């Protein structure tokens, strides 16, 4: 390689050269030298440029080392940190597995014999050589060749030389499983199977090694090559030692020459040492990952055999006055998707639709744009629900002979959502190949845990035999989609431009501070909460919505409840509709209003959808709701209208529109958790109910937390995932933060956090909330774990436990899991639950602990680990310990939160980034996960991977600075050889991919299907 300047080096690159130089000095036993001029002379004359690539100047290297706090420099002397280790440093993420096997290729195959021309190859000069330079040269030689050659050439045995081991080579890698913290040895065999002797010139790791050492009997080096005779085998021993469960890779290169006059050739081996426990072995992949394409084929013809519907458990006196159309997906939807994918050209109509999607949202395109976005989302929903379709399943008769029982694992968690009155389509397995089949429609009568009881026609029941085989087809419930379509159409009809695209308040003069006396005296001491309540009552923003920006733990729901009570008391003729996206959030509003005793309970009414299970309704709400015994009753409009406060979900608010409630009946509409809903869902509660001239819309939420879960990549791309709350705060001038803060006439940001210990709150506060949040949590509860004996630092209840694991997949599930992280999580659970109530730490219940993981498969594996753990599985209340995704924890809190980040492979981060899944590259998911904890936060993850992300790197550095880091040794993480990053490309295997119509969200996250009606 001719001498040339590198491309512009990063600070990390230059620092890596500095660490190489320190190791070079250590090799020469001159590390104790401190004279600056002497070191500069050694650097320039003995070290610099020795690998054929121009290194940075000495001053640049010193500057990079100084910035990393590893070197102290004066005018005349340089002092290197004594803690900098040499030789055995570096870990990076697990490389891809190669598809190539290491069989010896024929010499006449793709590999040509080395040139016999004598050359001055810098990697083959047979002179005494410093091992740092030797390693750097060897690595760069291989990387240089790798830019132009088939990567499989490096893995292949060649010219009669074979490099093998005691273990089998799988997918181009030696998998080495070890248990225990003692030293483990792996023998590598270098064998000459040819007819001529070969020079074995050197072997080396192509990067710094941590936890590994290499050894051989004759100390083979370039200046001490070993002549490998025909049929001779030479042993190289790789030793590994670590007390940390995890996965540790090593990349080794072996160099050979046919004689002194030929160019060297290389054989590369990847070793993956997996230090595992009994638990990690049990949780490993059940079978290799084989992606599976969804079966989307349908028979040419079919007929529907109508089933037996359940008797209505609801009595409907609320007559339909406003029609609700079907809003079926138009025929062009599939073609539009192909255009958006770039798979086909577009005609005039499709071009217009594409232009609508690519245009900014406005009142003029509001209806058309949201119609298109909802069509795109529905199309993907129809595809994703097929993930749950089943083949060759059997049913049995129920005790009620009119019903058949079908086992559906996952239905209790809404994967998928199946409600009373929904239907499934079943086809006899034996008829699937017929050109014309019968699909039996089975109506859901009851859902009991993971069983559903279905009502079919007499025709099927008469022919049914227990354990008869069927294929099962799931369908989506279109009611929420239909209501959203109608709502965006009604936006135009009811002239809601000033509400959805506000330009100013109609108040000419600002309102003076109100003299309201708040019911909740705690709010009197919180200026932001009081301001929000007063301005909502005064209507300072009308006709624009009033926003309550509520960061985690700041009491936004309490603020909304207080505002509702004050409006009811102080605004004559007020009628209030209080909504939320979920039943749980709506129930919380209702409970707080009824139990406050500041509003006559007879004026509050909670409306449930007919699909709601009466057994799940909170006792405190039963007498103030449309539940009577085991039935849901819809009162007539005349009976509902006198109530001053009506509470329901956003979807159920559409029932009020259908029932003919007059526009303007509700003077105020409140939406809590407004950031969780797509804009058309919010609009269900507004269009047809709110008078734009006189009404007040109030939205409460946090645009810095997760928004609604969507499945269609195009619906996400073109903005359906942007809630109305976030759209106003990011795109409307009225809600922008100025030099003096937000304009309180339109928005109030709550600042006092009543949940978390200050150390837990610090990083998200700085990253997302302009460092304005104030830690106001109760000191006794928030400091409960400050003296816990397992904290790395007393008084700092945040732990970052570094684990270098492996993100794996199994069977046909594309979702990831990491058993090394699970092992460490079980260790922390034992410490929390089995050795508690000691040393001043109060006893904790499993229900006060939450475990968060980004991928569905990790959630499942953690649950499995708890069930098989000898000590944890029988613990009282262990079933109440919640394990779930970030989305499932949003809006919740726990005393202790444990987070598993899963990611340990750099190649998969690209996937996370592209599709906005996982923790990395999704700052909202990070924010929600961190801010759930009240007293103790434990993060378990790969520090090498996480430090590459700006947000995670910030959090990790914070933990290191506060001495809250433990686990994998990162003392020398900055000494990582830059070449190691590039070596990953040598071992990249293109994983088997199958084109599937299933969304990435469904594949990796498998979120529960919403059933909030």
Swiss-Prot record:
Pfam families: AAA_11, AAA_12, MOV-10_beta-barrel, Mov-10_helical, MOV-10_Ig-like, MOV-10_N. Residues 91-129 are annotated as: Disordered. The keyword Nucleotide-binding applies. GO terms for biological process: miRNA-mediated gene silencing by mRNA destabilization; regulatory ncRNA-mediated post-transcriptional gene silencing. A motif (DEAG box) lies at residues 672-675. ATP binds at residues 550-557. It is found in: Cytoplasm, P-body. InterPro entries: AAA+_ATPase, DNA2/NAM7-like_C, DNA2/NAM7_AAA_11, MOV-10-like_beta-barrel, MOV-10/SDE3_DEXXQ/H-box, Mov-10_helical, MOV-10_Ig-like, MOV-10_N. One of its GO terms (cellular component) is P-body. It catalyses: ATP + H2O = ADP + phosphate + H(+). The keyword Cytoplasm applies. Its EC number is 3.6.4.13. Its main location: cytoplasm. Residues 91-103, 113-123 have a biased composition (Polar residues). Keywords: ATP-binding, Cytoplasm, Helicase, Hydrolase, Nucleotide-binding, RNA-binding, RNA-mediated gene silencing. One of its GO terms (molecular function) is ATP binding. Probable RNA helicase. Required for RNA-mediated gene silencing by the RNA-induced silencing complex (RISC). Required for both miRNA-mediated translational repression and miRNA-mediated cleavage of complementary mRNAs by RISC. PANTHER family: BRCA2-INTERACTING PROTEIN-LIKE-RELATED, CANCER/TESTIS ANTIGEN 55. Belongs to the DNA2/NAM7 helicase family. SDE3 subfamily. This is Putative helicase mov-10-B.1. It comes from Danio rerio (Zebrafish).
């Amino acid at each position: 390689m001719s001498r040339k300047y590198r491309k512009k080096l990063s600070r990390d690159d230059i620092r890596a050269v500095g660490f190489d130089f320190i190791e070079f000095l250590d090799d020469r036993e001159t590390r104790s030298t401190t004279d600056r001029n002497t070191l500069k002379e050694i650097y320039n004359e003995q070290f610099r440029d020795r690998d054929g690539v121009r290194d940075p100047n000495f001053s640049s290297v010193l500057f990079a080392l100084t910035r990393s706090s590893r070197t102290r420099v004066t005018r005349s002397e340089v002092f290197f940190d004594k803690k900098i280790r040499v030789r055995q440093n570096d870990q990076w993420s697990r490389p891809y597995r190669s598809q190539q096997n290491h069989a010896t290729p024929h010499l006449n195959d793709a590999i040509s014999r080395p040139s016999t021309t004598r050359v001055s190859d810098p990697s083959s000069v047979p002179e005494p050589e410093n091992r740092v330079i030797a390693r750097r040269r060897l690595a760069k030689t291989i990387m240089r060749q790798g830019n132009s050659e088939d990567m499989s050439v490096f893995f292949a045995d060649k010219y009669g030389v074979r490099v093998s081991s005691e273990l089998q080579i799988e997918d181009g890698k030696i998998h080495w499983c070890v248990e225990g913290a003692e030293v483990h040895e792996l023998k590598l065999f270098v064998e000459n199977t040819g007819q001529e002797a070969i020079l074995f010139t050197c072997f080396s790791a192509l990067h710094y090694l941590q936890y590994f050492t290499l050894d051989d009997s004759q100390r083979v080096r370039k200046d001490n090559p070993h002549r490998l005779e025909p049929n001779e085998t030479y042993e190289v021993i790789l030793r590994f030692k670590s007390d940390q469960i995890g996965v540790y890779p090593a990349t080794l290169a072996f160099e050979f020459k046919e004689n002194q006059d030929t160019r060297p050739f290389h054989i590369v081996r990847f070793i993956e040492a997996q230090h595992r426990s009994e638990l990690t072995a049990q949780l490993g992949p059940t079978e290799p990952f084989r992606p599976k394409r969804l079966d989307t084929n349908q028979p040419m013809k079919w007929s529907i055999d109508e089933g037996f519907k359940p008797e209505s458990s609801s009595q409907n006196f609320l007559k339909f006055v406003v029609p609700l159309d079907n809003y079926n997906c138009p025929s062009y939807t599939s073609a539009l998707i192909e255009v958006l994918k770039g798979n086909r050209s577009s005609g005039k109509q499709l071009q217009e639709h594409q232009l609508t999607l690519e245009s900014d949202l406005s009142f003029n395109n509001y209806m058309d744009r949201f119609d298109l976005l909802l069509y795109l989302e529905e199309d993907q929903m129809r595809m994703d629900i097929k993930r749950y379709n089943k083949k060759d399943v059997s049913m049995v008769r129920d005790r009620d002979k009119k019903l058949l029982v079908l086992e559906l694992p996952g239905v209790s968690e809404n994967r998928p959502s199946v409600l009373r009155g929904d239907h499934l389509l079943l086809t006899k397995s034996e008829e699937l190949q017929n050109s014309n089949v019968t699909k039996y429609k089975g109506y859901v009568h009851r859902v009991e845990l993971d069983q559903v009881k279905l009502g079919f026609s007499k025709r099927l029941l008469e022919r049914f035999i227990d354990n008869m085989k069927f294929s099962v087809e799931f369908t989506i419930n279109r009611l929420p989609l239909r209501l959203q379509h109608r709502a965006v159409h009604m936006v135009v009809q009811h002239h809601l431009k000033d509400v959805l695209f506000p330009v100013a308040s109609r108040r000419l003069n600002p309102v003076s501070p109100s003299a309201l006396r708040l019911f909740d005296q705690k709010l009197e001491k919180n200026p932001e909460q009081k301001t929000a309540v007063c301005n909502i009552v005064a209507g300072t923003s009308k006709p624009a919505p009033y926003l309550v920006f509520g960061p985690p733990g700041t009491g936004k729901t309490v603020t909304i409840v207080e505002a509702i009570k004050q409006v009811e008391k102080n605004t004559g003729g007020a009628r209030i509709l209080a909504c939320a996206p979920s039943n749980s959030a709506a129930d919380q509003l209702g409970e707080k209003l009824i139990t406050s005793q500041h509003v006559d309970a007879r004026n509050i009414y909670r409306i449930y959808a007919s699909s709601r299970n009466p057994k799940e309704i909170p006792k405190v709400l039963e007498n103030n709701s449309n539940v009577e015994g085991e039935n849901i009753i819809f009162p007539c409009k005349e009976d509902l209208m006198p109530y001053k406060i009506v509470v329901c979900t956003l979807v159920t608010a559409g029932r009020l529109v259908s029932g003919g409630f007059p526009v303007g009946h509700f003077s105020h509409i409140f939406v809590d958790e407004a950031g969780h809903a797509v804009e058309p869902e919010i609009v269900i509660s507004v269009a047809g109910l709110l008078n734009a001239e006189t009404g007040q819309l109030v939205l409460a939420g946090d645009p810095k937390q997760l928004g609604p879960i969507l499945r269609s990549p195009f619906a996400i791309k073109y903005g359906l995932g942007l809630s109305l709350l976030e759209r106003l705060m990011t795109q409307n001038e009225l809600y922008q933060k100025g030099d003096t803060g937000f304009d309180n006439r339109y928005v109030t940001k709550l600042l006092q956090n009543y949940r978390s210990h200050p150390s837990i709150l610090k990083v998200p506060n700085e990253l997302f909330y302009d460092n304005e949040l104030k830690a106001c949590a109760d000191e006794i509860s928030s400091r409960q774990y400050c003296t816990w004996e397992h904290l790395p630092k007393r008084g700092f209840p945040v732990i970052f436990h570094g684990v270098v694991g492996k993100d794996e997949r199994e069977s046909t599930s594309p979702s990831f899991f990491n058993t090394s992280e699970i092992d460490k999580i079980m260790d922390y659970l034992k410490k929390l639950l089995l050795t508690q109530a000691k040393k001043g730490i109060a006893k904790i219940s499993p229900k006060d602990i939450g475990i968060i993981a980004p991928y569905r498969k990790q959630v499942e594996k953690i649950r499995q680990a708890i069930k098989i753990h000898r000590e944890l599985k029988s613990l009282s209340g262990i079933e109440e310990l919640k394990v779930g995704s970030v989305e499932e924890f949003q809006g919740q809190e726990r005393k202790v939160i444990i987070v598993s980040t899963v990611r340990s492979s750099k190649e998969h981060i690209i996937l996370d980034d592209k599709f906005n899944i996982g923790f990395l590259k999704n700052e909202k998911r990070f924010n929600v996960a961190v801010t759930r904890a009240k007293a103790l936060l434990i993060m378990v993850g790969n520090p090498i991977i996480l430090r590459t992300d700006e947000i995670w790197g910030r959090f990790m550095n914070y933990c290191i600075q506060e001495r809250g880091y433990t686990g994998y040794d990162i003392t020398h993480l900055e000494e990582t050889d830059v070449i190691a990053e590039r070596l990953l490309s040598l071992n990249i295997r293109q994983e088997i991919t199958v084109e599937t119509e299933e969304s990435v969200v469904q594949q990796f996250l498998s979120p529960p299907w919403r059933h909030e009606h």
